[in-house]
Regions:
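Alpha-helix termini
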Residues: 20, 38, 71, 132, ...
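Conserved non-catalytic scaffold segment of RNase H-like nuclease domains
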Residues: 1-115, 125, 137-151
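Acidic, Mg2+-coordinating catalytic module of metal-dependent nucleases/exonucleases
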Residues: 85-91, 97, 134-190
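Catalytic subdomain that performs nucleotidyl-dependent activation
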Residues: 114-132
Length: 191
């Protein structure tokens, strides 16, 4: 199974108010193993970045001035995610922004390019009801080192989320591993 653990950084909170993606990153997981393949791109949004958003990710409009626009990277991004399950923390936020960017290009929704979308925030809320379930809180709870995360960044956050997701779902492969081990030790007697 091929999965892309995905994150974006944006100019603000709402694409309906003209906010844009300024960074997108995905790390590839195949059969529950990181492959070291990733997609990462900073994007020129052709607009100002809200102060609140910049305080979260530290990315300035000046830094993005010479970066490509989403239209320039859309096809390579879509090729990277094609056919994969997307795993995203607070998926409606990122999917909403991706769909807004694709709509500006006359392209269909991101879900037409991927197998499915899994929201790790929803998973975390189901697994840890009543607890904080931010990426930082999950890293702390699952003992994943995020000490190098001073600001949000799409690639770093996708890498951390991959570790979080694999830890949160680690029991899901337990039965298949036991079955595979048992299947190897089964012998058939033909009478």
């Amino acid at each position: 199974m091929r999965q892309i653990i995905l994150d974006t950084e944006t100019t603000g909170l709402d694409p309906r108010q003209g906010h844009r993606i300024i960074e997108v990153a995905g790390v590839e997981v195949v059969n529950r193993r990181l492959t070291n393949r990733h997609f990462h791109q900073y994007i020129n949004p052709d607009r100002d970045i809200d102060e609140g958003a910049q305080a979260v990710h530290g990315i300035s409009r000046e830094f993005l001035a010479d970066k490509p626009r989403f239209a320039d990277i859309a096809d390579s991004f879509l090729d990277f995610i094609d056919g994969a399950e997307l795993v995203i923390h607070n998926a409606p936020f990122d999917v909403g922004f991706l769909n807004a960017e694709l709509d500006l290009l006359g392209k269909p929704a991101v879900t037409t390019f991927c197998e499915s979308v899994t929201d790790t925030l929803k998973m975390a809320r189901d697994n840890y009801p009543g607890k904080r379930n931010s990426l930082d809180a999950l890293c702390e709870r699952l003992e994943i080192d995020n000490s190098h995360r001073n600001l949000h960044g799409a690639l770093l956050d996708a890498e951390l989320l991959a570790d979080v997701y694999l830890m949160m779902t680690r029991g899901q492969d337990g039965l298949s591993m036991v079955f595979e081990e048992s299947a190897q030790s089964i012998t058939f007697n033909s009478d």
